[in-house]
Structures are given as structure tokens and as C-alpha cells.
């Protein structure tokens, strides 16, 4: 018997895959801009981008203070 919780998890995963697929096209430069607009803020893509930007900013701040 399928439990309601399993059903809900399946639906959420399915929607997440559909949403992630919206940003991918053959044109790489256009797809990157579209991904940032269409992906939810909680996705790994945004988390990693934010982390990279903060590291780059910290590095540039260190360079300026030298």
C-alpha cells in the first residue's frame, strides 16, 4: 500500500525536476540567465552561487587592504 507521505514526496520531487529542467537549453549563455530567474531561491545552484560570490568579495576585499 502506498502511504500518503510517499505520494507527497514523489510529487514534490517530480515538480523539482520539472522546474530544474526549465532553465536548460542548447544556448548556454542564455540558459544561465534564465536559470537564475526560474530556479527557486532554496536550490543548490543559488546557494553555491551566493557562496562563491561572497568568497570572491572577501578575496577582493583582502586584496584591497594589502
UniProtKB/Swiss-Prot annotation:
Keywords: Secreted, Signal, Toxin
Tissue: Expressed by the venom gland.
Domain of life from the UniProt record: Eukaryota
Region (Disordered): 43-66
Signal sequence residues: 1-23
Cellular compartments annotated: Secreted
Cellular component, GO, one term: extracellular region
Basic and acidic residues composition bias: residue spans: 53-66
Molecular function terms from GO: toxin activity
Annotated family: Belongs to the scoloptoxin-24 family.
The protein, known as: U-scoloptoxin(24)-Er2a
Amino acid at each position: 500500500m502506498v502511504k500518503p507521505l510517499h505520494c507527497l514526496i514523489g510529487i514534490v520531487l517530480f515538480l523539482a525536476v520539472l522546474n530544474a529542467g526549465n532553465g536548460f537549453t542548447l544556448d548556454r549563455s542564455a540558459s544561465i540567465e534564465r536559470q537564475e530567474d526560474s530556479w527557486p531561491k532554496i536550490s543548490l545552484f543559488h546557494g553555491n552561487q551566493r557562496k562563491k560570490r561572497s568568497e570572491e568579495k572577501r578575496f577582493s576585499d583582502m586584496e584591497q587592504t594589502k
